[in-house]
């Protein structure tokens, strides 16, 4: 009896020692992981220690909750909106990177997650029922296999009102059913995506860019709203956070992030020094340079590239807003929403910049941070209906400017 008790004690001591050894090995691996950089090393960790079934169940539960109600219709009644397929958290002074994409352009999220270290929000547009289903499967696969997606990304879905999205069943065979890592998901997405001409959806449904932008920036005190095929400079999120933490004086200021486009997107410049070198040899140029030079000209690129190099991000100079400037910017306070009547191509961003000006915001250009669009914007890369859409939205923009006079009767500013 006494011997049996001693044996049991020895067994439990041995079991406890084994459990402690496993725990120490996991802690050791985590400490080694903290010294590594890049998505590949993080994925290797999650291959050794995959997320618990509970965390995956939570992802599925969130998707089910978001999809169960059938979504809500937007103000026009043309679109069905599913908020919060994925959710993220942020503190009051955080800056969220807000973007929008068609389903095939979600592959750009990988590059954004590498460069932007803070919270990210993406609104996805699915033009067909099949795309809506693919979007939910992608949300499940990305959040199941990509730690950064679970931790930092909010995802919303918009589709035509006549369609409804359904909860994906990961057990069913399909394009993403057998994937095991984050990189595999993005690789598969790159293979099944059908890159097309800008705004050419292949349907009679309009791309609701401003609805998507508003949805992506909902709930954020500070947001940088960009196109999904743009990449921010390295450290931009950290620099903005430090600025906002040190001062609360930016409530009525739009902090302009200069935007460029690069001829070849094989290697995107990480810092201003790399960008300026490419700019000087013509590999990088101002955004929209070949389509609408005045749309970005007030940024004053020649002044910006010649600013002395600094380690801290700060506003470098003030620029009075003028038509048709449509800068990319970070702003807090009561920022006007994007007018959702503007769809497809033309005047969808400038209308919001115009209202920002009339509402009393000032524009200050940041010294170091920047955005780079992948590829030169060329007229031939747009769909045939671009000019007709532009003319339609031009008429709407004239009406919009008249409406601003009634909305801001005491403002001395006009567009």
Swiss-Prot record:
pH dependency: Optimum pH is 7.0.
ATP-binding listed as a keyword: no
Reported tissue expression: In the adult, highly expressed in heart, brain, skeletal muscle and kidney and to a lesser extent in placenta, pancreas, spleen, prostate, testis, ovary, small intestine and colon. Very weak expression in lung, liver, thymus and peripheral blood leukocytes. In fetal highly expressed in brain and kidney and to a lesser extent in lung and liver.
Keyword Transmembrane helix attributed: yes
GO CC terms of this entry: extracellular exosome; Golgi apparatus; Golgi membrane
Reaction catalysis annotation: 3-O-[beta-D-Xyl-(1->4)-Rib-ol-P-Rib-ol-P-3-beta-D-GalNAc-(1->3)-beta-D-GlcNAc-(1->4)-(O-6-P-alpha-D-Man)]-Thr-[protein] + UDP-alpha-D-glucuronate = 3-O-[beta-D-GlcA-(1->3)-beta-D-Xyl-(1->4)-Rib-ol-P-Rib-ol-P-3-beta-D-GalNAc-(1->3)-beta-D-GlcNAc-(1->4)-(O-6-P-alpha-D-Man)]-Thr-[protein] + UDP + H(+)
Pathway: Protein modification; protein glycosylation
Spans within the Cytoplasmic topological domain: 1-8
Binding site for Mn(2+): 227, 229
Residues annotated as glycosylated: 204, 300
Top-rank EC class of the record's enzyme: transferase
The enzyme's E.C. designation: 2.4.1.-
Cofactor(s) essential for the protein: Mn(2+)
Membrane topology: Single-pass type II membrane protein
Listed transmembrane segments: 9-36
GO molecular function: glucuronosyltransferase activity; metal ion binding; N-acetyllactosaminide beta-1,3-N-acetylglucosaminyltransferase activity
Keyword terms, alphabetized: Congenital muscular dystrophy, Disease variant, Dystroglycanopathy, Glycoprotein, Glycosyltransferase, Golgi apparatus, Lissencephaly, Manganese, Membrane, Metal-binding, Signal-anchor, Transferase, Transmembrane, Transmembrane helix
Record's function text: Beta-1,4-glucuronyltransferase involved in O-mannosylation of alpha-dystroglycan (DAG1). Transfers a glucuronic acid (GlcA) residue onto a xylose (Xyl) acceptor to produce the glucuronyl-beta-1,4-xylose-beta disaccharide primer, which is further elongated by LARGE1, during synthesis of phosphorylated O-mannosyl glycan. Phosphorylated O-mannosyl glycan is a carbohydrate structure present in alpha-dystroglycan (DAG1), which is required for binding laminin G-like domain-containing extracellular proteins with high affinity.
Subunit structure: Interacts with LARGE1 and LARGE2.
Disease: Muscular dystrophy-dystroglycanopathy congenital with brain and eye anomalies A13: An autosomal recessive disorder characterized by congenital muscular dystrophy associated with cobblestone lissencephaly and other brain anomalies, eye malformations, profound intellectual disability, and death usually in the first years of life. Included diseases are the more severe Walker-Warburg syndrome and the slightly less severe muscle-eye-brain disease.
Designated name of the protein: Beta-1,4-glucuronyltransferase 1
Organism: Homo sapiens
Gene: B4GAT1
